[in-house]
A protein has these predicted regions:
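Hydrophobic alpha-helical segments of integral membrane proteins
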Residues: 3-8, 56, 60-64, 254-261
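Membrane-interface helix-boundary motifs at transmembrane edges
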Residues: 29-37
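Hydrophobic membrane-insertion alpha-helices, especially the h-region
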Residues: 39-54
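A structural signal for short, hydrophobic/glycine-enriched beta-strand patches
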Residues: 50-246
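Membrane-embedded alpha-helical segments of integral membrane proteins
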Residues: 1-29
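Hydrophobic residues within the alpha-helical transmembrane core of Major Facilitator Superfamily
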Residues: 23-24, 49, 261
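Structured C-terminal subdomain patch of bacterial secreted/periplasmic proteins
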Residues: 244-267
């Protein structure tokens, strides 16, 4: 399923659509359908041009982040409640040990800073850092931001679905331990849902929340987003001139919407 999601995501992406259009145009030209090839080629160029413009970020990117703004501004860490743990989703840091001993901060590295801010503000002591190679890539920056290593737990996962399932298993185990009495028999009584502050990029939060609602229903999730990249970029205006950064943002946004819609259909 992991690789199927990757393939489908590429095929419906702006770049995937552009490649498909180009291939169809070439095939039509080779078959002698030159007029049709020109039309398809022109539409493909227009398609890619559109997705490379900042104006499309307003259409597909900004709506992903809007509900997480408070009066049009990024919420302060002081506004979030105290919780049992901070769940820091992966995808913001990376490391290639064959190349360097130091991790690279990607565009979503604000997530790590947000988790550290929440920790230092006393919102939760435990930080669960997820992702592929989270210890190697993320621990160093968390420690630089003042989070003690003893407060950090790591969960290897390749995508958001695996992160939600893994965090759910961690808390199922914790709840079981809490409700065991001295004889090792599970005691009866009301089970209180553990509360976590979910930290990820604002544009990713809608889909992440859906995954946690499905795969970790025993957890109360409070969204604590960082990295409002779409909203920040959209502040630059409604330009229709193409640029590579807009193509990147819009491709990310389309990927998120495909995941959200796909989840709704599969649910």
């Amino acid at each position: 399923m992991y690789y199927i999601n990757k393939i489908v995501g590429f095929l419906v992406s702006p770049i995937g659509g552009g490649i498909a259009g180009g291939v169809v145009a070439v095939v039509c030209a080779r078959l002698g359908r030159k007029r049709l090839a020109k039309w398809i080629g022109g539409l493909t160029v227009a398609w890619l041009w559109l997705w490379m413009t900042p104006i499309m970020t307003w259409v597909v990117g900004v709506p992903l982040e809007g509900e997480f703004l408070v009066d049009g501004k990024v919420p302060l860490v002081e506004s979030f409640p105290e919780a049992d743990a901070i769940v820091l989703l992966g995808g913001s840091m990376g490391i290639e040990t064959n190349l360097s001993s130091y991790a690279e901060m990607w565009s979503g590295a604000d997530r790590v800073w947000q988790a550290a801010r929440l920790h230092k503000a006393g919102k939760a002591q435990q930080v669960i850092a997820t992702g592929d190679g989270a210890r190697e890539s993320t621990l160093g920056l968390l420690k630089d931001f003042g989070v003690a290593e003893r407060c950090v737990e790591f969960l290897d996962a390749r995508n958001t679905e695996e992160e939600a399932k893994g965090v759910g298993k961690i808390w199922n185990h914790e709840i079981h331990k809490i409700h065991e009495n001295e004889d090792g028999v599970t005691g009866e009584g009301e089970t209180v849902k553990p509360k976590v502050l979910l930290v990820t990029s604002a544009w990713h939060m809608k889909r992440a929340r859906l995954m946690f609602e499905k795969y970790a229903p025993e957890i109360e999730v409070v969204c604590a987003p960082a990295d409002f990249e779409m909203s920040m970029a959209a502040k630059k205006g409604w330009s229709v001139l193409p640029d590579a950064y807009s193509l990147h943002l819009n491709s990310v946004a389309v990927h998120e919407w495909v995941g959200i819609v796909g989840y709704g259909v599969m649910r």
